[in-house]
Amino acid sequence: MVGGGTVKKDLKKAIQYYVKACELNEMFGCLSLVSNSQINKQKLFQYLSKACELNSGNGCRFLGDFYENGKYVKKDLRKAAQYYSKACGLNDQDGCLILGYKQYAGKGVVKNEKQAVKTFEKACRLGSEDACGILNNY
């Protein structure tokens, strides 16, 4: 920093900047709000929805988790699978891994082992060690 000064930590101000960034369609601003316990859960869902709309694989995967676990929304395995699918399409390795599990087990999607293998292959290419391990044992 110029002059050697420091900025005092101010979580409230940081949240304001993240919210503003999210409102200005900056997906990282939206995602930065995820781990903050001071955020209203309904608002958090809105910020994640916006991140997903802005093509954040992480945002879509988090929404999938919410629907799968009934966290802040009514549990809906089909919607969860749709969000995991979008996350995978955006090259989110964990989204692909989870979608592969869903396809293999037929949870929220039609059971399709061939498609599950393809999805695990993509997750493995994206760096998922778990997916690579599944393929090695298949």
UniProtKB/Swiss-Prot annotation:
Main enzyme class: hydrolase
MF terms (GO), sorted A to Z: beta-lactamase activity
Gene3D superfamilies (UniProt xref): Tetratricopeptide repeat domain
The enzyme's E.C. designation: 3.5.2.6
Entry function: Hydrolyzes 6-aminopenicillinic acid and 7-aminocephalosporanic acid (ACA) derivatives.
Other remarks on this protein: Antibodies against HcpB are present in sera from human patients infected by Helicobacter pylori.
Family per record: Belongs to the hcp beta-lactamase family.
UniProt name for this protein: Beta-lactamase HcpB
Organism: Helicobacter pylori (strain ATCC 700392 / 26695) (Campylobacter pylori)
